[in-house]
Amino acid sequence: MITFLRRRLGSRLLAAGRRLLEGVQSPDEQYRDFNGRYFASLHEQERMLADQPRMEFYRAAIQRHIQPGDRVIDLGTGTGILAALAWRRGAAQVYAIDHSPILKHARTLAEANRIERVEFVATHSTAFFPAAPVDVILHEQMGDGLFDEAMVANISDLRDRVLKPGGLILP
């Protein structure tokens, strides 16, 4: 009788627990959603664009390391400024990847500035598969959330899957 009650109660508790968990996001999904909303904020993007030392660093690094004809990934493109700088440097193809809604603004800015050879890709980096390996991965995967966002894992994944041997990761 006790075994029967335990089984009966246990299965009911399990079913109730499953109902409670339906639709609940994992911690990774919750963080990805938060991160997407945070960096989709035009205010946050404006703050980053106004950071003169940051912008000068990226401009100089792109000028120095991206060669005309290179294939480039701009991971977490935001407004697309790094993709635009790579295009201006002469990259043959730039993949501007972002999983946040900011990507629509990046597309609009690129069209308004007649930027070509930039493919805007709305996905997470782990789901991105370019037609051919790339020469350079540009990113700004830094900050106090380095491990929370799986930034190291995401960069390592791209490096292992899509970066040419001898390719660069900037910074």
What are these regions (language model features)?
Residues 107-131:
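S-adenosyl-L-methionine
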Residues 25-66:
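Class I SAM-dependent transferase core
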Residues 69-76:
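Conserved class I S-adenosyl-L-methionine
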Residues 93-98:
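Conserved SAM-binding motif I beta-strand of class I
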Residues 152-165:
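A short glycine-rich, Lys/Arg-flanked "PGG" loop and its adjoining helix->strand segment in the class I
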Residues 1-27:
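N-terminal auxiliary segments of SAM/dcSAM-dependent transferases
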Residues 165-171:
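Conserved beta-strand signature within the Rossmann-like core of class I S-adenosyl-L-methionine
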Residues 79-90:
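Conserved SAM-binding loop of SAM-dependent methyltransferases across substrates and taxa
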